[in-house]
């Protein structure tokens, strides 16, 4: 946990240094994963929230951020009462061409680290195993959407994003997760 907090503080300080420059931005984002899947058939819907900051070059931008994905629950086959949450630390780049005076297209890629906390029971008849796993994995994602600027400093961003994470194996479980969802965010431009 200390390691996650340290990485979060480092990412925020990096984002803050970008935000102090001309063209810098900071923002908050909320979303809903309408398809959050783990290897083995486990899936659920769940909300997420995050913060980000970076530098806007007008036609493109770079950013760093932290996103928390709330608890998901499911049972599948012999795995019962599975619950998982994610903490995602990402860096990304986006192409942001102007469509009209107030509208921009957003298309980008991001990568980073994702921490999963997974708890479940495996019911094998007479034997019940309990899993309590925390793993850090590499994620790769993409997003597409739009941005509407109210004025030179305030903007509303919305769209769809998806990412896939590969975690190290634990307890003979090969962890991979995929999240697909919609997001809505507010950005303040300096």
What are these regions (language model features)?
Residues 32-34, 68-70, 162-165:
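Generic short beta-strand segments
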Residues 24-40:
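Short N-terminal segments immediately surrounding and downstream of signal-peptide cleavage
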């Amino acid at each position: 946990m200390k390691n996650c907090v340290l990485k979060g503080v480092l990412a925020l300080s990096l984002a803050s240094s970008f935000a102090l420059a001309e063209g810098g931005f900071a923002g908050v984002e909320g979303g809903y994963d309408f398809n959050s899947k783990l290897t083995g058939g486990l899936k659920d819907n769940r909300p997420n929230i995050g913060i980000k900051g970076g530098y806007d070059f007008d036609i493109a931008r770079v950013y760093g951020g932290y996103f928390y994905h709330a608890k998901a629950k499911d049972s599948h086959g012999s795995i019962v009462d599975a619950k998982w949450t994610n903490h995602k630390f990402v860096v990304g780049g986006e192409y942001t061409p102007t469509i009209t005076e107030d509208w921009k297209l957003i298309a980008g890629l991001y990568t980073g680290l994702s921490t999963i906390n997974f708890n479940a029971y495996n019911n094998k008849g007479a034997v019940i195993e309990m899993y309590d796993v925390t793993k850090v994995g590499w994620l790769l994602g993409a997003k597409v959407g739009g941005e509407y600027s109210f004025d030179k400093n305030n903007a509303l961003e919305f769209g769809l994003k998806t990412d896939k994470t590969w975690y190290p194996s634990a307890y003979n479980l090969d962890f991979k997760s995929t999240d697909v969802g919609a997001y809505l965010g507010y950005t303040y431009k300096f």
